[in-house]
Design a protein with these regions (language model features):
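N-terminal cap/leader regions of alpha/beta-hydrolase-fold enzymes
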Residues: 1-250
Length: 250
């Protein structure tokens, strides 16, 4: 399946508060495909997130990236300048964990209505802010596999305030892979150690990957991009996501 052509579109997901815009990428060939939710950085569903979504679809998945800042900034998508970082953080600070969970559940319900979907095979991936969101989503019963990239604040906070997201670890029933840079100023190594210990304590099937990089090493549009780390991490993501496939679809 790898490398097959894909189809992309912008979709509207019904939600009890209105609707959520989302970027959808699907394999063009008929089949039965797992679903992967793609969670944005603070920069919205921008070119990088759309590219990741397409890469996942090309590997044989239905991939969908909901706009997580839809309430404050519909269809938000910006770059990586200092001013844009400040803008993205402003919207992040207006987003709560309860809203995110509600949006994720709405996205899963929407995905289940799509043609060629395997509704029992759902995973997620997220980067930066989205890496934190992915850890939060991992505790949902629908999520079987999670890839969380450099999510800051997991042991100390949750979006909008409340108990730290790390407290949801006992509810993770699937497999979670986390990816961190040991030179990331936003995520001290002591926090990475704590996440790893907590996952082990609660017997969550997991792997914690550490790279000698800074923050955002997977994104080739950021100054901390690290080709070797990004390539290695992508191979781990593919291995993880392929566990969702039936033997005849790999």
């Amino acid at each position: 399946m790898t490398g097959d052509t894909i189809t992309t579109s912008t979709e509207s997901i019904s939600h009890h508060t209105g609707s959520i815009s989302a970027y959808l990428a699907t394999p063009s060939r008929p089949g039965e495909y797992p679903v992967i939710l793609v969670f944005q950085e603070i920069f919205g569903v921008n070119e990088h997130i759309r590219h990741v979504t397409k890469r996942i679809a090309a590997e044989g998945f239905i991939a969908i990236a909901p706009h997580l800042f839809q309430r404050t900034a519909p269809n938000f998508a910006i770059g990586y300048s200092p001013a844009e970082i400040m803008e993205g953080r402003l919207h992040k600070e207006q987003t709560t964990g309860a809203q995110l969970i509600s949006d994720i559940q709405a996205t899963i319900r929407y995905a289940h209505t799509l043609p060629f979907v395997n509704p029992k095979a759902v995973g997620c991936i997220g980067f930066c802010f989205g890496g934190h969101v992915a850890y939060l989503a991992a505790a949902l019963p629908e999520i079987e596999v999670t890839a969380s990239f450099y999510g800051a604040g997991i042991p100390t906070t949750t979006p909008g305030g409340g108990l730290p997201t790390l407290e949801c670890t006992p509810n993770i029933h699937g497999t979670i892979y986390t990816f961190f840079g040991t030179q990331d100023p936003l995520i001290p190594v002591t926090q990475i150690d704590l996440i790893e210990r907590t996952l082990s304590t609660h017997h969550v099937n997991h792997q914690v990957f550490r790279y000698p990089t800074g923050h955002g090493f997977f994104c080739d549009q950021r100054s901390d991009y690290h080709r070797e780390a990004a390539t290695h991490a992508w191979e781990q993501v593919k291995t993880l996501f392929n566990t969702l496939k039936t033997p005849d679809s790999i």
